[in-house]
Amino acid sequence: MPVWSWVAGWILAVAETTELLPEAKAGEGDLLAKILESNLINIAIILTLLFILGRKVVGEALAKRREGILEELRQAEQRKREAIERLAEEQQKLAQAQQEAERIRKQAEANAEARRQELLEQAEREVERLRANAEKELSSEQERVFQELRRQIVRQALSKVEQELPQHLNEEVHRSLIEKGIQMIAR
């Protein structure tokens, strides 16, 4: 109701202003005043209708827009919270991944060190084995050389004895030598 009272007051004010207009020539003033008065009344009615109807439409549009903005703000806040949660989760995953990478790196270093030690020990064992084989082969070769030298010395000695023996050999010496030879072989 307050709107109608305001509209009625406004229409009365417009009507009063038309009476205050100076009249033009006789006959024209009445017509001009009536046209002006009817135009002002029409404008007042149109403005009132626009105000009443427009206020409702504009109010509804503004309310809808306000609700839309509030909903968008709520959604933005929700997305922000979700993004913060995802960021925290991803940061936690990153920290875990970094810890896992550090653990893997340390494990790899430990494995590499263990493998290096194993290879060094294996190399030392191989060197020792080769050294022992070399010493064994050297000893075996020395023994073979000594045996060969003994054989050659014995052959040479026998050859020399065979050459000189017939000149110094008699029956008794011959038997004595055979017995000594048998005894030497028997040992």
Swiss-Prot record:
F(1)F(0) ATP synthase produces ATP from ADP in the presence of a proton or sodium gradient. F-type ATPases consist of two structural domains, F(1) containing the extramembraneous catalytic core and F(0) containing the membrane proton channel, linked together by a central stalk and a peripheral stalk. During catalysis, ATP synthesis in the catalytic domain of F(1) is coupled via a rotary mechanism of the central stalk subunits to proton translocation. GO terms for cellular component: plasma membrane-derived thylakoid membrane; proton-transporting ATP synthase complex. Keywords: ATP synthesis, CF(0), Hydrogen ion transport, Ion transport, Membrane, Thylakoid, Transmembrane, Transmembrane helix, Transport. Belongs to the ATPase B chain family. It is a single-pass membrane protein. Its main location: membrane. This is ATP synthase subunit b. It comes from the Bacteria. HAMAP family: ATP_synth_b_bprime (MF_01398). GO terms for molecular function: proton-transporting ATP synthase activity, rotational mechanism. F-type ATPases have 2 components, F(1) - the catalytic core - and F(0) - the membrane proton channel. F(1) has five subunits: alpha(3), beta(3), gamma(1), delta(1), epsilon(1). F(0) has four main subunits: a(1), b(1), b'(1) and c(10-14). The alpha and beta chains form an alternating ring which encloses part of the gamma chain. F(1) is attached to F(0) by a central stalk formed by the gamma and epsilon chains, while a peripheral stalk is formed by the delta, b and b' chains. It is found in: Cellular thylakoid membrane. It comes from Synechococcus sp. (strain JA-2-3B'a(2-13)). The chain crosses the membrane at residues 32-52.
